[in-house]
Amino acid sequence: LLTISKIVSDNMRDDPTFFILQASRRLESRSLARLGSTVNGLLPKRAVVLNAFTLMLSGNTTSLGEYLRSLPPKQLSDRTLARLGDMAVAIQDSDSAAHLLENRQTTNVALSRSQARHSWYLGNMQDAVELLETVVPNTNRQLRHYRSELDVFQGRMPILNHGESNRRHTGGSIPTTALHFLTNSLPHTGSGYAQRSHSIMTSLGDQGWSLEVLTRAGYPLSIGKFRARAVDVIDGVAYRRVLPWKYQSDMGAKVQQQAGALAEAVRRLNPGVLHTTTDFTNALAVMTVAEAFNIPWVYEVRGQLADTWASTRPESAKTSQRYKLFKEREAFVAAHATHVLTLGEAMKAELIEQGIPDAKISIAPNAIGDDYLEEPIPRSRARGMLGLSMEHQYIGTVSSLVAYEGLDLLLEAAAELIPANPALRVLIVGSGVEANNLQDLSRKLGISEYCVFPGRVPREEARTYHCALDIFVVPRRNLSVTRAVTPLKPVEALACEVPVVAADLPALRELVVDGETGVLVAPESPHLLAEALRMLLGNSSKRASMGAAGRRQMLAERTWAANARKLSETYKVLADKLQ
């Protein structure tokens, strides 16, 4: 209870608007969206903040942004601007935040704090700290948060005392225990990240490794899972939660707590290898413990998270202090890891550009789990299970609904196709910050009755949705992050004998063989996407041959068992070198 109270209290004192928005999103309540829309319609026009707040709760961030940009800042009080600016930053709408907050000189504390939040959001970390220092005391939660995070980005490391270190392996045998440190995990998070982690570990278990996991400090309480247990055992893998009695929410203190928890686990387990994943804050704790105990460690680079961060911001974010430091810290931990693991050739090339030796890097691509090794569910049966008609053609995706996935382009392409193909349906499975915006766009395009949005589904049901599709679509936007990172869901679609139409980006070329397992189209062109879809929708034999070829390729090249065999050998070589 103390940890829960600390998490809620710190978030409310730091950025209450963002915390309320995140909490409302986790509810995933349609009634909440309806309530926001209803209340917004009843409020008088002068109730500016309440109008904006109900739009925010409804999840329609596009409409909220339009509303905020329509307001005249000079006619609004400092306090009102502060509240509206906080909403703009919370929904990641920098244009609206700039419209409201820039060029307003003030000594008002609330408005200055909002301006600092916008500066921080843009990556101007030192500027945000200096602005806060002029208006709030050193004890202010927001200021302490920013200072601590800036310290970590600038090089602060956790420190272990002598009692927590200097353990070395003894004897001639190589310990066959691997300790993993993760950002999140099953059963509380069902993301591709969590599924990949679990697949790697269960497959390593089949190779004779004992696996145990620690998750980041405060998780899963920090995502609202207040009834979580201290340990979850899933398929023989123990997921232990780091839930300290005195939880620290500042980044530096949190990394320190994580290092202490890892040191404790090392003394208990005597592991042969430590393994963690992006981002670098995970690696700082693992690196500190690995060096103190003389244990090899693997850094698994699953994304270029500085680019992911920049993808939701103006182009100027790539010249910001945060972006520069983020890149530097990621390169620093990768350079210090005993071994680096990544998802594909595009990401390996980026690591080599950062100065990581080729010989130090190996690839474990996103792969298919045991359920996808089974024969795909026949399409008619899958649709019957889901209540979908065999009279329709379904195009769509199973994905996190975020902006860089480019699903608005899919809807625009569908709007071009539907007049000539009224049997066409768009199936978008998943949840995320763009969910309400996509539904709103489908209404604006006049195709809402042709679109199905089931929301987030259990991972075992995702396979059924894959099998129900005629074509799986990956219309990702052309960004640094999408050029480098290979997603998991298209791999699963191909394993289900579903052809894939995808944006022609380097990472997606590693998955889709153009003309054989799917079609690659120039990114960010709804018309070209529509043309590729039209061609495949009109050729059932081509869809069938592409689907069969895709499944053969996935079974031959992308299984977790094959990944685990290679990773197990890597673990053994690393541990053997340090005996």
Predicted regions span which residues?
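N-terminal subdomain of nucleotide-sugar transferases
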Residues: 1-53, 59, 139-232, 237
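A short, well-ordered alpha-helix in the C-terminal region of glycosyltransferases
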Residues: 384, 423, 528, 535, ...
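Conserved acidic donor-binding segment of nucleotide-sugar-dependent glycosyltransferases
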Residues: 514-515, 519-526, 535-541
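Short hydrophobic beta-strand element within catalytic cores of glycosyltransferases
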Residues: 474, 492-495, 499-502
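Conserved donor-binding/catalytic core segment of Leloir-type glycosyltransferases
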Residues: 178-180, 389-414
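Nucleotide-activated donor-binding/catalytic signature segment of Leloir-type glycosyltransferases, i.e.
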Residues: 437-461
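A short helix/loop element that forms part of the nucleotide-sugar donor recognition site in Leloir-type
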Residues: 164-166, 374-388
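Carbohydrate-associated surface elements
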Residues: 217, 346, 367
